[in-house]
Amino acid sequence: MEGRSVQENGKDSSNGKDSSNGKGQRRSRHSRPGNVDLNGAPAIVSETHPLAMVYGGGGIFGIGYCVGVAHGLAEGGIPVATAPALGTSAGSWAASAVALGTPYEDIVNLEAPPIPNRTSGVLARIARELFGEATHPLVSVSAVTVRTRRRHILDGGHYPLADLVAASSAVPGLLPPHRIDGRLYVDGGMWSATSVDAAAKSKSVIVVAPLAGPHMGPIGRGAGYLLGRELHAWKARHRDRHISLIRPSRAIARYAGVNPMNLFDADRGRAVYPLAYEQGLRMAAEIRDKVAV
């Protein structure tokens, strides 16, 4: 469990002009309801929630890890299902599943697509098997536009969750981009594996980061360094609030191995779930008195 985050000055890097909306939140000229171009700026939310969740990327391994931790936290008395949740890549599946109360058995029974896969709409088709056309106002996801390479935060109250997870999980070179409102999006992890700075405004934040930490090898060390910067900036911005970091233990990290393609192994995702559940249950006991619920 750690604390840290990232910041932005609200200026357009191409011309130096201030392109924020006056609140520190950047909006493009073509912003739509439910689609905010943050490009690194901290999220501005009118309502302050007791708790917000952030679920990071990590392939099918990451889905199993995030959902397992979330279910363990819930069993331990942390109200993750009613907290606004931001998901990136694998984390977008977890955020959606937890908010909708989707049983983990339904997730693991989905047929994972072969990787790499160029079939247009493959992720959306699988996601619709799980989520249908459901929307949910507490879910948002991070995705990156193909044309501008800027991060957008997409609101699950405005778009079907199936489309959001397809956009946020479209790993370049492995899975095809997904189109929403005429824009092509790829994996939000191209910007940040977690996007802690875009978490909903809240008194407490819990970050579940499947890729971060020394036990995850070179990828984990790199992801952990970047996440550390995000957490540090978050704490500097929110000195009166609490943030908790949950990342894989050594035993859990062994399921990922050293080959990055292991992250897309469905069997590893299934195997990691019960261990992640137990970790979430333990963490609930540790952080319960620090989390505003």
Model-derived features: positions:
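Patatin-like phospholipase
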Residues: 1-88, 94-293
